[in-house]
């Protein structure tokens, strides 16, 4: 059998996530990207069936109420000659752990920056995570229909704060009420902006060349002159686009536009599909796995509960690393050492699920999970592999969780363990008492847990403050030393949702003392799934 059709499918795939600070316009960009992919016909409206008002990529109840993307959705759409898998990551301040893990499942990222504000805190944190794997980054400077900071300043800030070289591909002409469009440096043409076209794909009005008198006539002599002067400076001072540096994560192409006005998004998508890598090889503990291998491999990076409230189901999101998924195929669930038959995997269009007939390396599929699949699990066509680099992060905030009705302890524990398996929260059970301590990376996670315990497990829970500053996973190669450590630190030890031994420190001083007293013991701030 010829391998050509399979290789052509894999080479078409582009799998990326959007990273940004909350409110930089990520959900709007997602909508406009889908519009260009013709996945939806009018934007504003990334809306599923049955709702006329909610953006389609935000679909849990709480997200609808608060207007934030709390869970990671996956959307697939065609663009140019590629098939794009877009992973939407939670944009809200709090939802970082899920976001970090999603970044392990993509081959490139789109960084969205609010051009009025520049580099913000959350963007820095997310960039640090992409650095762990040198992920290629494309940058979109958003909100040019508002008054923005000086574009040169923005480039300098990205370079100095995020430690990545910038190569502008387009350049803005004016901003706010004066925003006229962008000049595309690589194509030597000006694309003019029309207002009020945000919900549809704009008919492009293009002026060829920088010295074309039509440019002065359209944007006004002053702005045209300003553009020529700025470009002279920019082209002299900034980097040219370099594919090799981009693929190493050392340089980012920069596009300017307004997602709300649906302008410039297509230039960015053109760049992304032209330059971003097709599915990359991935490191397993045993060896590196190439996307073009014909045997299937994949790993689970996220578990999402109740995507369909009518069915209490959980979906495990799997990134296919190599080979092809076909309906009804047998897979080896490596952690359990068990052969499973997968006949009902799903593909995604944010909340609209359809059964996958076939999927290829680079694609994300959903497996129905009845409690046997965990984050980090590897599935193969026989080989015993474990993909590495899907981390759990030590929580930064802690609360004790308590029941209003003490008879529901069993349901509470079941609910918390399931929520911790899907990464919504981490749960710790101290060895010395029956407390249940919940750990999160952001405050909003606590609200989500209580809301979901109520709607999914019919358990009413409340929080109390607890004297915990931080948690560390404990490991020690010397069984005798570990035993001594456990005897002397009973009051500070707990088991997490996966029964891993954890040190719960009331203060950072306490943690540092414990480290000094037991140098043989490792206190880890992250744990691989």
Curated annotation (Swiss-Prot):
Give compartment(s).
Cytoplasm
Under the heading Gene3D superfamilies, the entry gives: P-loop containing nucleotide triphosphate hydrolases, Peptide chain release factor 3, domain III
- A GO cellular-component term linked to this record: cytosol
Q: Which pairs of Cys residues are joined through disulfide bonds in the record?
A: none
Which residues hold GTP? 20-27, 88-92, 142-145
Its primary localisation, in coarse terms, equals: cytoplasm
Task: List GO molecular-function terms, semicolon-separated.
Answer: GTP binding; GTPase activity; guanosine tetraphosphate binding; translation release factor activity, codon nonspecific; translation release factor activity, codon specific
Domain spans labelled tr-type G: 11-280
One biological-process term from Gene Ontology? Answer: regulation of translational termination
The identity of this protein, by name, is: Peptide chain release factor 3
Tell me the organism: Vibrio vulnificus (strain CMCP6)
